[in-house]
Amino acid sequence: MSNGIVIIGSGFAARQLVKNIRKQDATIPLTLIAADSMDEYNKPDLSHVISQGQRADDLTRQTAGEFAEQFNLHLFPQTWVTDIDAEARVVKSQNNQWQYDKLVLATGASAFVPPVPGRELMLTLNSQQEYRACETQLRDARRVLIVGGGLIGSELAMDFCRAGKAVTLIDNAASILASLMPPEVSSRLQHRLTEMGVHLLLKSQLQGLEKTDSGILATLDHQRSIEVDAVIAATGLRPETALARRAGLTINRGVCVDSYLQTSNDDIYALGDYAEINGQVLPFLQPIQLSAMVLAKNLLGNNTPLKLPTMLVKIKTPELPLHLAGETQRQDLRWQINTERQGMVARGVDDADQLRAFVVSEDRMKEAFGLLKTLPM
């Protein structure tokens, strides 16, 4: 017997898809399979749990049972999918299997842990489940090392510092947020973190970790070392593509999908952090929301392509929040930066003086939507 639409995953992407399908069809069979509890929580909240004194269970917004009842679902929590037989259209776990008409892969991405000696001592904060496993250690830690100065690393560094902890942030780039914007734009946030007491080790490399009687010894390059109580990996995300690979799907940085969110197999789709849409991986909430709306229509028989507008990315650093949009990582832009006490507006323009990107901070963030309208589509 077919289970209709089968979705592997239970995070934000999967839930958005369920809600959009149910807006259009109240009865089509929907089956969700996931390795976690399937309870709903807001993942961006993980960047602020320490300063707000929240436990993992405090993040739960809706239990799996409530979710199933509200949306008429068949749920299989704590279930690892072991194989996909794409030819027979069957999903398999160790103790069960499910026939599907259409299959959606929405399992997200896992935190990348740098392959250094002692890497097993590093913690990750990419899910409620991961936070639950280490919340006591993080709450009790006085000295914290964060590996990675990107978006998540910068958010966590500020949060742990606001909680009164001694924070060191290490990155091999010369500035924080290096993959998102040039140093002259990120310097305002970098200066604020330093003012707060975050010890920035830029152009530096973690070489290994070792447990000691009094904590964890982190060995760095240039014969340096520091001792801390906890180490957090914030060096990016990697989709777990082994399952899709065994199903014969085309893989690059994620599972490759077209504008219809369809993989190289006509009956299998991918969504969220797991998907690479026409060559782009977009691990942000707005593109996932828009993708879920389009995919719901297509699973129900439409043929609607995904058209993504230029979108804002929000960096949730409360002492100095930032919004950015456009091609902020382009190397050939000329940046016009206006700074004042209330905030910053940085405009990135090309050789023709066309606005291609912007970054705004603090009180100047209210200008973001006006600037967004002037960016080319």
Swiss-Prot record:
Record's subcellular location: Cytoplasm
GO molecular function: oxidoreductase activity, acting on iron-sulfur proteins as donors, NAD or NADP as acceptor
E.C. numbers: 1.18.1.-
Swiss-Prot/TrEMBL cofactor(s): FAD
Enzyme class (EC, first level): oxidoreductase
Keyword annotations: Cytoplasm, FAD, Flavoprotein, NAD, Oxidoreductase
Reaction(s) catalysed (UniProt annotation): 2 reduced [nitric oxide reductase rubredoxin domain] + NAD(+) + H(+) = 2 oxidized [nitric oxide reductase rubredoxin domain] + NADH
Keyword hit for tRNA processing: no
Keyword Mitochondrion: no
InterPro entries: FAD-bd_OxRdtase, FAD/NAD-bd_sf, FAD/NAD-binding_dom, NO_rdtase_NorW, Rbx-bd
Name of a matching Pfam family: Rbx_binding
Gene3D superfamilies: 3.30.390.120, FAD/NAD(P)-binding domain
Protein role: One of at least two accessory proteins for anaerobic nitric oxide (NO) reductase. Reduces the rubredoxin moiety of NO reductase.
Family indicated by similarity: Belongs to the FAD-dependent oxidoreductase family.
Protein name (Swiss-Prot/TrEMBL): Nitric oxide reductase FlRd-NAD(+) reductase
Source species: Shigella boydii serotype 18 (strain CDC 3083-94 / BS512)
Upper classification of the organism: Bacteria, Pseudomonadati, Pseudomonadota, Gammaproteobacteria, Enterobacterales
This protein's encoding gene: norW
